[in-house]
Amino acid sequence: MAQKKRKERRYVPYGVAHIHSTFNNTIITITDPNGAVLAWASGGFFFKGTRKGTPYAAQLASESVAKKVQQTYGMKEIDVFVKGPGPGRETAIRALQAVGLDVKSIKDVTPIPHNGCRPPKARRV
């Protein structure tokens, strides 16, 4: 049987963290500068149901992704792009800093319509 060629570890010292935060969940994706995904996690990795959308779930997801890219790719610096209005936005950024990644910039890329689609009707509770 042929020997498997061992995959060499790629060194990526700088990356981009994309934090997509909705009211129901928070998804953190870390990519290299070209946009190739290195690691990702979401609140649903750790909790199910309504607890996915909590800041604590976002913190756990952010910490796990940051540790993975530090150990696997030797990443030290990141830029952060935040999208969405959810409760996990700030917590996810703080968790990235707490793990030891150097956050160079934070940019809000939440899509804002210039009077596009009609919004859904208001809930009557």
Curated annotation (Swiss-Prot):
Domain of life (superkingdom): Bacteria
GO function term, MF aspect, one: structural constituent of ribosome
GO biological process: translation
GO cellular component: ribonucleoprotein complex; ribosome
One Pfam family this sequence matches: Ribosomal_S11
Keywords assigned: Ribonucleoprotein, Ribosomal protein, RNA-binding, rRNA-binding
Function: Located on the platform of the 30S subunit, it bridges several disparate RNA helices of the 16S rRNA. Forms part of the Shine-Dalgarno cleft in the 70S ribosome.
Subunit description: Part of the 30S ribosomal subunit. Interacts with proteins S7 and S18. Binds to IF-3.
Family from the record: Belongs to the universal ribosomal protein uS11 family.
Family matches, as HAMAP family: Ribosomal_uS11
Protein name from the UniProt record: Small ribosomal subunit protein uS11
Organismal lineage: Bacteria, Pseudomonadati, Coprothermobacterota, Coprothermobacteria, Coprothermobacterales
